[in-house]
Structure formats: C-alpha cells, structure tokens
C-alpha cells in the first residue's frame, strides 16, 4: 500500500467517525443493535432505566436486577425491536418483570411492568427441561401477548412513582 493510499484510508476513517457521531446525535439509539444481547441489557438498558428512575437500586442477584421500596424485586428484560423474545424468565425469583422494548429506528422506549404472579397469563414456554424448574422464555410478538401487555404499559414517570412508593 502506498503512502497516498494510507492517507486516503485515514481520511475515509475520519469521515466515517464524523458521520457516525452525527448519526448518534440525530438518533441516540442508532448504535444499540451493535451490542451483544447480554451486554446491551447490562451495559446500556439497565443504566438507562436507572438514570430515569433513581428510586431503583441495582443489585447483583441471580433472580432480579433492581430493588425498590415500592415494587420490591424487579427483573429487567430488554429487547431491541423488532426482536421481542425474552429468555431466562424466573417468575418465582422476582416481584415484577420490567419488559423494556427499544425501537432503535424511532428512538422510542416501550415499558411494561408485569407482576410476576401474572406472568403465566402470557403462556410462556419452559426454557430448560434439565431439571431447572421455573425458567421460561417467550416472544412478545404474538397478538394475544401484545393485547395482554397493553394493560401493563407504563411511562418512566409512572415507573418512578411506583418504585418510590408514592
């Protein structure tokens, strides 16, 4: 590769970085699909929720992610639309599930706070048959589940009020 070609590649890299920065300014969610699923949930979604709902406390627990005075133990399940499958759901380990669905194209959040006691209404699929009881997965895409979810939709403000026990 010639020195001129190396310089041109450096220019292109600089232009790409500049365009990516502009894209993220226009749509802060534009890069979310680049995260692995686990990293997206733990490194982006959970801190994003905590920043908007400070009454939650992050915990290092196997069965739930947050705790609060108003809601107790909350397990967060995050998806980037159009994907809507949630895995490793253990309704016996938490008081609520917070399904956080992020529309990366429209830069919108859709939050659903489902009491764990109502989780089985969604007819989830048993995820493991190796003796691990109470572990489920499900797609939130089905018409029946979308109808069920509507009653659990919350805004960040509503979520914060409930977490704070107000």
Write out the residue ranges for each language-model feature.
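Nucleic-acid endonuclease domains
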Residues: 1-72, 77-166
């Amino acid at each position: 590769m010639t020195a001129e070609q190396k310089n041109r590649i450096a220019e292109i890299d600089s232009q790409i970085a500049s365009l990516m920065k502009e894209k993220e300014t226009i749509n802060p969610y534009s890069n979310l699909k680049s995260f692995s699923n686990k990293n997206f949930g733990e490194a982006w979604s959970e801190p994003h929720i905590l920043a908007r709902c400070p009454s939650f406390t992050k915990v290092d627990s196997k069965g739930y992610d947050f705790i609060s005075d108003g809601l107790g133990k909350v397990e967060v399940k995050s998806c980037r639309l159009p994907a809507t499958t949630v895995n490793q759901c253990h309704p016996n380990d938490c008081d609520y599930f917070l399904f956080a669905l992020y529309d990366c194209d429209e830069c919108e959040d859709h939050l659903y706070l489902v009491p764990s006691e109502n989780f089985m209404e969604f007819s989830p699929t048993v995820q493991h048959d190796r003796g691990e009881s109470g572990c489920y997965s499900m797609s939130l895409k089905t018409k029946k589940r979308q109808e069920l979810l509507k009653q659990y939709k919350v805004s960040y403000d509503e979520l914060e009020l409930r977490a704070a026990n107000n």
